[in-house]
Amino acid sequence: MARNKHPEETVSLILDVAARLFMEKGYEHTSIQDIIDNLGGLSKGAIYHHFKSKEDILVAVTDRITSESNRMLADIRDQKDLCGREKLQAIFKESINRPEQDAIFTVAPNLGANPKLLFSMLGETISDVAPNYIRPILEQGIADGTIEAACPLELAELIMMAANFWMNPMVFDDSVEKVRNKTVIFCQMMKGLGLDIVDKELTDRMVELTAVYQKNR
């Protein structure tokens, strides 16, 4: 078989097709064969040359979405006209409302059944998002007096673990009501930490996304 001179184009095509099928059918209801059937003649071998499993494809699709999210985080972190508190508020508002969230919850992977993706997301949160995006904002807020807190790195990790995992119905397969209750507790926790920056909008949006997830399972 001739060597593929443009492997990055093949990978991009596979991810484009997989992302579309995950959106249309849901991750759990999309098979490797479904992806092959929509690749315009590419063989199963072409897929397995780049990805060992459907879960590997999901991780790569999610990495694409994460890169968009990180650009948003960097833009807010680097704004010169916002104090630390305002930046943290903006992070929550933009994160929960960005269109990519609807895509993720529509794909509806059960993270408990896909440990590779869950571990990848956990590693990204602890090694990159918390220290490189959230901690600098907390440090700025502490310095400018708009945030009263200690241990900004550990606080950044706690906030992101709660927001990205504990409240995430794709991790614990929670009902709409359970997620609603968790967001209420999260808001109370943030207030207790001196971070009264989340409101009913967060609760309503998390309930909305949970309903999307449950519908597409």
Report residues per predicted region.
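Hydrophobic alpha-helical connector segments
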Residues: 60, 74-107, 156-159
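Amphipathic alpha-helical core segments of compact helical bundles
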Residues: 93, 160-164, 168, 187-191
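Helix-turn-helix
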Residues: 2, 13, 21-56, 60
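Short secondary-structure transition hinges
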Residues: 100-146
